[in-house]
Amino acid sequence: MCTLVLAWQVFADTPVAVAANRDEMVDRPSEPPQRIDDEPAVIAPRDSEAGGTWIGHNEHGLFVGITNRWTDAELAGDRSRGLLTRDALRKESAEEAARFVESAVRDHEFDGFNLVVADENAALLLEWDGQLAVRNFQPGVHVVVNVGADGDWRIPEERPEDGRQQGENAA
């Protein structure tokens, strides 16, 4: 289960605060957070297998984080979701990153994901299960897991027990 907790516009001096874990595949090799890009400067861990990342922050104040999304759809997933995250981190704002993701899902096949983009002005959730849904977050604390966000859970038929348990744990 991957979990991402976003506190957006909750703290006066910190418009974006995040806590996250990546524990679905604990044996997957990764490198610790480091500067992975210079234009703009991006700090993120690196997935040693596919070369992307699952979470990061850039010099413009843009945060991008992703969780896998469990779906019943058979998705081709020809491009790494971590590369999508890395590329979104090259944008200047959450709105620009969201537009980039909207374009990327038209051009490439991805496995299911929940992708959060946030800066001081906007916070959005982009949910991909073969179709893209975009949700604007309101100021507050938001919990994103493999089956959805903020109590809007979509439990896949292939993993009903895991999905229900994940929703209960995140509530």
Where are these regions (language model features)?
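N-terminal nucleophile
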Residues: 1-171
